Amino acid sequence: MSLKIRLTRGGAKKRPYYRIVIADARAPRDGRFIDKVGAYDPMKAKDDPARIVLDNEKIQSWLAKGAQPTDRVLRFLDAAGLAKRPTRNNPQKAEPGEKAKERAAKRAEKAAAPAEDAAA
């Protein structure tokens, strides 16, 4: 049985509230879970300590048993110092795409053409 540490949504419409739970990976998002290990309230201010509540002892024991946190939960655990999130490296992210390069080349040609006409 593959275990995940993930969020289950609660709350009302347009007022989300998430529980951080241990659940089987095949279970539905808001379905059956094994243990509740925390809560996340995105409606609270970012600097509010009650925005993310974690039970550190339970989380550490479940991580030791092999439970895998989802990406969002891993961010919370990394901020709390319970787990290390690997850094991602995408050197091509800052590069413009092919179409943007083509547009820039056309703009450069158009800018160079009037300058040549003025010099002649």
From Swiss-Prot:
One of its GO terms (molecular function) is structural constituent of ribosome. InterPro entries: Ribosomal_bS16, Ribosomal_bS16_CS, Ribosomal_bS16_dom_sf. One of its GO terms (biological process) is translation. It comes from the Bacteria. Residues 95-110 have a biased composition (Basic and acidic residues). GO terms for cellular component: cytoplasm; small ribosomal subunit. Residues 81-120 are annotated as: Disordered. Keywords: Ribonucleoprotein, Ribosomal protein. Residues 111-120 have a biased composition (Low complexity). Belongs to the bacterial ribosomal protein bS16 family. HAMAP family: Ribosomal_bS16. PANTHER family: 30S RIBOSOMAL PROTEIN S16, SMALL RIBOSOMAL SUBUNIT PROTEIN BS16M. This is Small ribosomal subunit protein bS16.
